[in-house]
Regions:
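Intrinsic low-complexity/IDR segments
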Residues: 2-8, 14-294
Length: 294
């Protein structure tokens, strides 16, 4: 009985110490950000809400839009986030608070158990979420990445939103898996876009994207509909060995070389009203599955 009581006391003390450690860690991170010191956290389970908009005073940048300016480099490796992680906040009066990161934003080999929201964030350093898992929704709408951005080997279990995003340098989603809807509508990619060997299990929205560099979707699987309609591909597009259900490239402009070799198409591939600056690529699929302009 004595040993049991001692064990229980030890567990209570350990629990309290863990809670205090998590709270203290959050407080110390806030202090570091306030003093522009870099953040580096590895192999931690974080049971606190991470809200970058709450660590610094926000300043008005336009009507109804405020912004905090984080000068610290942010690095998390092999961490588990039990609560939401956010760099966006909507206030009761309808105004919003965004976050500008002057350094890198790095979450490598991390696991997010709740929603992640970087809507409207500007990241002036490297963006790196390599090999991280998003168990709930991930919102990167209107994200501005000024350096290379890495989302390779990521797993997105919930809905993914990248509408109206801007990428100034290379973007890498190689070997990423998307288990819910994924939208990149109206996003601009100023350099190479890499999606090779990705897997989309639900609707993939790439309508109205503007791709200024080379685009690679080789060996990618689209289990549901994929829509690239009304998009611009200024340089080469690689779409080799892809597996498609219903894929639309209607009203697109292809200004570089296009490769559609060895496609698998379950339902249809549509290129209606699309323009090719060079020769129309050879597409070896049954004619009834290929839709072209008359």
């Amino acid at each position: 009985m004595k040993h049991f009581i001692l064990a229980m006391v030890a567990l209570v003390q350990l629990s309290c110490a863990t809670q205090n450690s998590s709270t203290n860690e959050d407080n110390s991170m806030k202090k570091l950000i306030k003093t522009d010191q870099p953040i580096y956290i590895e192999n931690k389970t974080i049971d606190e809400v991470i809200d970058f908009t709450s660590y610094l005073d926000a300043h008005l940048i336009s009507e109804g839009v405020y912004q905090v300016n984080v000068k610290s480099g942010i690095t998390f490796k092999k961490c588990v986030f039990k609560k939401p992680v956010s760099a966006f906040r909507k206030m009761e009066d309808g105004s919003v608070v965004l976050t500008s990161f002057q350094g890198n934003v790095t979450f490598i080999d991390c696991f997010f158990e709740e929603d992640v929201n970087f809507r409207g964030s500007s990241i002036y350093g490297r963006t790196d979420f390599t090999n991280s898992t998003f168990d709930k929704s991930a919102n990167f709408e209107e994200l501005h990445c000024h350096e290379n951005a890495f989302f390779n080997k990521c797993i997105f279990e919930g809905a993914l939103r990248f509408q109206n995003a801007f990428f100034n340098q290379r973007v890498n989603f190689m070997n990423a898996e998307f288990y819910d809807t994924a939208s990149f509508q109206n996003s601009l990619f100023n350099s190479e876009l890499q999606f090779s060997a990705g897997k989309f299990f639900k609707y993939a929205d790439f309508t109205l994207i503007d791709c200024r560099g080379r685009v690679l979707f080789n060996y990618t699987e689209f289990r549901d509909k994929a829509d690239f309609s009304h998009s611009i591909f200024a340089q080469d597009l690689g779409f080799i060995n892809t597996k498609n259900h219903t894929t639309n490239f209607d009203s697109c402009r292809f200004l570089g070389k296009v490769r559609f070799n060895n496609l698998e198409v379950v339902s249809a591939l549509s290129l209606t009203d699309s323009y090719f600056m060079f020769d129309i690529p050879e597409i070896n699929i049954p004619s009834e599955k290929l839709m072209n302009s008359k």
